[in-house]
């Protein structure tokens, strides 16, 4: 279900939104998005077009279609990968603010970009908290990275969202996040995580590809060992079946020989067969046949 909110003075709306505290902005959007999968703001006074994966500001909203994006599933995956202490209060994602479509002179571009960066940093971390405008991050990798900054000082850096989006789109988010955090801890040992560049992302992708190759090699090795085991079991089963058949044949010939001897002896004696095949003799014959 998509909710439509009418805006009759876009400039005033943008000014009032930017004048809110960070907590006020986040609380407002979190409440709105908790009730709807997408938000549509229909602007009546000026021509605008601004879009994220979950929000649209447009003078003609009926002409714009949202792409499929399971927001609840993404929130669940993020919560499994990162412990964000304030997630119940701020159920928001970088995707809610990452602009896919923008227009020149947009008064909301800066605040949306800042919010996208804040939540990208949060979900790149092992754990994070957001309190009174202070963002605290803990990133556990080969080293441990502790980071703290004021949210109003966070600068624009598209690489943060790129890494976040790569982690949580396709593949195993847990494995990807662990590799990303290892690289971030190494690359940001003496530099600010906000200043990472394309080389950091390239290094993360390269290490992940090596990880996949190692996993494929281990899978092939395990498959080969399993095939050898199955082949060995089948071979031993066949040998056992042949051995069992040979024993059965041997015992069968012995029984036939015994019966022939008994019948022959009965011909030359006056003792009836009923007295020879007693219950005990029959039990012994059956035991010999099937041993």
Q: What residue ranges belong to the model's regions?
A:
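Transmembrane alpha-helical segments and their cytosolic interface motifs
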Residues: 222-266
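Extended, non-transmembrane interaction/recognition domains
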Residues: 2-195
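Extended aliphatic helical segments
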Residues: 43-48, 64-65, 216, 233-234, ...
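Short, non-transmembrane cytosolic segments of multipass membrane proteins
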Residues: 179-218
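Transmembrane alpha-helical hairpins and terminal membrane-anchor modules
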Residues: 250-291
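Alpha-helical transmembrane segments of integral membrane proteins, especially early/N-terminal helices
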Residues: 158-176, 207-215, 244-256
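A contiguous, surface-oriented mixed alpha/beta subdomain in the mid-to-C-terminal portion of proteins
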Residues: 208-216, 220-223, 247, 266-271
């Amino acid at each position: 279900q998509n909710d439509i909110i009418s805006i009759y003075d876009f400039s005033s709306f943008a000014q009032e939104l930017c004048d809110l505290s960070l907590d006020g902005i986040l609380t407002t959007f979190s409440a709105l998005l908790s009730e709807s999968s997408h938000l549509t703001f229909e602007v009546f006074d000026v021509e605008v077009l601004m879009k994220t994966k979950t929000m649209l500001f447009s003078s003609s909203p009926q002409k714009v279609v949202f792409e499929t994006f399971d927001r609840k599933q993404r929130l669940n995956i993020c919560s499994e990968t990162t412990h964000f202490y304030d997630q119940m209060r701020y159920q928001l994602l970088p995707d809610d603010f990452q602009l896919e479509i923008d227009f020149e002179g947009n008064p909301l571009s800066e605040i949306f970009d800042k919010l996208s960066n804040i939540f990208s940093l949060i979900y790149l971390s092992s754990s994070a908290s957001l309190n009174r405008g202070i963002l605290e991050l803990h990133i556990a990798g080969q080293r441990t990275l502790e980071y703290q900054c004021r949210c109003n000082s966070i600068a624009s850096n598209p690489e943060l969202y790129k890494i976040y989006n790569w982690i949580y789109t396709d593949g195993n988010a847990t494995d990807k996040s662990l590799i990303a955090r290892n690289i971030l801890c190494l690359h940001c040992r003496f530099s600010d995580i906000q200043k990472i560049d394309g080389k950091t992302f390239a290094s993360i992708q390269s290490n992940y590809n090596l990880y996949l190759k190692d996993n494929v090699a281990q899978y092939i090795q395990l498959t080969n060992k399993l095939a050898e085991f199955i082949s060995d079991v089948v071979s031993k089963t066949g040998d056992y079946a042949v051995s069992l058949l040979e024993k059965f044949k041997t015992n069968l010939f012995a029984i036939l020989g015994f019966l022939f001897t008994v019948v022959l002896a009965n011909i030359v004696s006056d003792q009836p067969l009923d007295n020879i095949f007693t219950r005990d003799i029959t039990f012994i014959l059956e035991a010999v046949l099937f041993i």
